[in-house]
Design a protein with these regions (language model features):
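Feature of Fe-S/electron-transfer and energy-metabolism proteins
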Residues: 1-351
Length: 353
């Protein structure tokens, strides 16, 4: 368990060394699209073949550094039409439309050897693209919120912390005043991810000034539009980043309870969020007296029932309360009387923080 900032930094450095000792990494996309295409079968098949070949294999980041090949189930790479996807590091090779029968060749050429399987690379206009970053689909993208998706084990808190995770929470707790946090979010220009585009900093400011003792932070992960998978990709691919953003919102506003409202039709997102919350609680990063700061924060998941209208704020809070998900007349707004009639920060943009 991590009790304070010193232990958080020690944990980070320890597992960072373990990551650096892994001389090759196999990242198999475990987003919903690739899983539907059989990516988990590919993961198990290639891992089995590698073990049978007598090569050192790990599926979990160990405390002590070991030279080994790491097998990881990553979040969504975003290139779903070409799935199942598999990435080999440190080379950055991305294999597309991989099948279980391709695993023998991947083992021989890319794991035992140091060359790509050219037929599995992405091809366009007669050219093969070895590095993922050079593929036209990715080349002009600058990933900010999705920076970890496709590059890390979505379920490993050790890897998240090793890459700097929960350092922002430590900074908010010990190096910043609550007003400074709110002002920084306002200065960033961050807005909601829905159609209204309401400034996130103003929501934090309005909830922070409320005199109520009990306040809430609610993440709206309910996207009802057919074919809209923005929220799902974030929750599946980098759940700890969502948790950390909600915690910072809690620090800024004086809220100690959070809810993630997620569609029940996203079972993988629900599973990964549950795993992430349990891991954070086990390490002492959720619960009472986080990092010996005196700040408490708990987080719960509420699964929606598929109602499109529950994407609207007041309908969403009604659904969490166990009532029929119906919008109410405003004012009062959720920042004044939201969940259980208490001031509530309701947003998905908190993950950007």
């Amino acid at each position: 368990m991590i009790h304070n900032v010193r232990e958080l930094n020690k944990f980070k450095n320890q597992y960072k060394k373990s990551m650096e000792a892994q001389y090759k990494k196999v990242l198999v996309c475990a987003g919903t699209g690739c899983v539907a295409g059989g990516s988990l079968e590919i993961f198990e098949r290639l891992k089995q073949l590698t073990e049978e070949a007598g090569m050192p294999v790990s599926v979990e980041l160990k405390k002590e550094p070991h030279e080994e090949i790491a097998f990881k189930k990553s979040g969504c790479h975003g290139f779903c039409e070409m799935g199942p996807l598999l990435r080999i590091e440190p080379f950055g090779w991305l294999y597309v439309k991989v099948k279980p029968e391709d695993c023998e060749e991947i083992l021989e050429k890319s794991l035992k050897g140091d060359e790509p399987v050219e037929r599995l690379l992405f091809h366009q206009d007669g050219k093969a693209y070895a590095a993922e970053e050079e593929i036209p689909f990715y080349k002009k993208q600058t990933r900010i919120v999705l920076s970890n998706c496709g590059h890390t084990d979505a379920e490993a808190i050790e890897e998240y912390i090793a890459r700097g995770g929960y350092q922002a929470v430590a900074k908010a707790l010990f190096d910043m005043k609550t007003d400074d946090i709110v002002q920084e979010v306002m200065d960033s220009g961050l807005r909601g991810r829905g159609g209204g585009g309401f400034p996130t900093g103003r929501k934090l400011q309005q909830v922070a000034k409320q005199k109520e003792v009990r306040k809430f932070v609610v993440c709206n992960g309910d996207e009802g539009d057919p074919g809209a998978f923005m929220d799902r990709s974030i929750m599946e691919g980098d759940p700890h980043k969502m948790i950390e953003g909600m915690m910072i919102a809690g620090i800024a506003t004086g809220a100690h309870e959070g809810y993630i409202y997620v569609r029940a039709e996203y079972p993988l997102a629900v599973k990964r969020l549950q795993t992430a919350i349990a891991a954070a609680e086990k390490q002492g990063l959720l619960g009472d007296n986080i990092l010996d700061s005196g700040f408490d924060f708990t987080l719960r998941i509420n699964q929606g029932a598929g109602a499109f209208v529950c994407g609207e704020g007041s309908a969403l809070t009604a659904s969490i309360e166990g009532n029929r998900g119906m919008p109410r007349v405003k004012p009062p707004r959720t920042v004044e009387q939201g969940l259980f009639g208490k001031p509530t920060v309701l947003s998905l943009s908190l993950i950007h923080i």
